[in-house]
Amino acid sequence: MAYLIDIPFEYFSSFLGVHPDQLKLLFCFLSAYPFAGILKRLPSAPWIRNLFSISIGLFYLIGVHHLYDGVLVLLFDALFTYFVAAFYRSSRMPWIIFIVILGHTFSSHVIRYIYPSENTDITASQMVLCMKLTAFAWSVYDGRLPSSELSSYQKDRALRKIPNILYFLGYVFFFPSLLVGPAFDYVDYERFITLSMFKPLADPYEKQITPHSLEPALGRCWRGLLWLILFITGSSIYPLKFLLTPKFASSPILLKYGYVCITAFVARMKYYGAWELSDGACILSGIGYNGLDSSKHPRWDRVKNIDPIKFEFADNIKCALEAWNMNTNKWLRNYVYLRVAKKGKRPGFKSTLSTFTVSAMWHGVSAGYYLTFVSAAFIQTVAKYTRRHVRPFFLKPDMETPGPFKRVYDVIGMVATNLSLSYLIISFLLLNLKESIHVWKELYFIVHIYILIALAVFNSPIRSKLDNKIRSRVNSYKLKSYEQSMKSTSDTDMLNMSVPKREDFENDE
């Protein structure tokens, strides 16, 4: 059967000029929809639902992609995590699991780098599982701590007992997100597989308690297919390798940046398509359910991984990153960024750099990843400085109401964000060190020069001067508001009030 199933993929591959494994991946994306519909209608017994999820996941890996060794890789990571988390009760437990699982994922990237192939391998699934397993380890660790030491997010994610092995393997091989994500925490899977996330919707007169999700699921499916069609069309018109040609090198600088932005946008379409398709299957299965909105309609964004509109029109780096690969960003934030920082202290540049370094290792071994993510760490720091020390001048003194030029600030921010990210993404796409540096050189290293200048400015006395001006505006506003409130206060009320001095406002932080 393993060979018979290849026949239609090889036939259409020669007909369409597409690699068979790409067609297999598309088949898995689309077939996940009817399988998700079946999963949703299975008896509510968790063991049945878990076994079905595991069976379809193994069918994709072994039956479709023939990744026999890959299944062993995933099983090793899963069982190592499960037993270490269960029996090693130490504060070092989550770090040991994190290092081993990330290191194993990185070693798979190294092997793929040394022996490149167009065939699908296990690394993509291993990357997804890396997020799930390391998050699982932290959830087990948090479950052994007093609630008083946990944040509200950690309390919700904490596991007070080790789950049944069947539940855990169902989580590992959950088929709608097995190949390209999205990743999510174990508690979400358990609440889904036991149907407890739907209990508030239960109707004693209806057999099915999960809300209907066919319409939003099909919406994601059509959008995903549209993005993939646009990617195939756009990549033939705006090929990435054009950036390495003499024609690109001889183009005017504005035309170069325009081409870079379009090329980066076309490259993103592939990710938009894959993530929309997998999100649709998750929605149809029910795990995408995220409660009710203010109109009492179901929300389907629990495992949403991308918001193309928010990303493309983001007016700052923070908003852009929050809209891209959203579940990976949640993982990086909750299980790297916040965990690296010492308890009681706010995360700083160390956490930022550690997060982007882990992100680069998680993506692969190619130099382009490290060029992108290390540069992104610095540009995110510059964006924080800008938001903290420049943005207030475009707000009214109450620091909430937009000033007359706030819209101009937002437009400039949107253009700068898109240009900066497109510039940095080039090395992520090219991967090769020499080629990445070559393209950046053709772009005059403008973004990197801006980063250096901005860091120098914000770490000079200029920052203190900006802060003093902001503080002066705020204090003047507070004093003026106080004086106005005094004018509207009766004499009797004033006798019962302690009047603050001007110094109280000047010393206000």
From Swiss-Prot:
Catalytic activity annotation: a 1-acyl-sn-glycero-3-phosphate + an acyl-CoA = a 1,2-diacyl-sn-glycero-3-phosphate + CoA; a 1-acyl-sn-glycero-3-phosphocholine + an acyl-CoA = a 1,2-diacyl-sn-glycero-3-phosphocholine + CoA; a 1-acyl-sn-glycero-3-phosphoethanolamine + an acyl-CoA = a 1,2-diacyl-sn-glycero-3-phosphoethanolamine + CoA
Membrane topology: Multi-pass membrane protein
Keywords, ordered alphabetically: Acyltransferase, Endoplasmic reticulum, Lipid biosynthesis, Lipid metabolism, Membrane, Microsome, Phospholipid biosynthesis, Phospholipid metabolism, Phosphoprotein, Transferase, Transmembrane, Transmembrane helix
Name of protein: Lysophospholipid acyltransferase
Biased composition (Basic and acidic residues): 500-509
Subcellular location per the Swiss-Prot or TrEMBL entry: Endoplasmic reticulum membrane; Microsome membrane
Leader peptide range in chain numbering: none
Name of the gene: ale1
Phosphoserine modified-residue sites: 490
E.C. designation(s): 2.3.1.23, 2.3.1.51
Residues on Cytoplasmic side: 36-55, 116-223, 268-410, 463-509
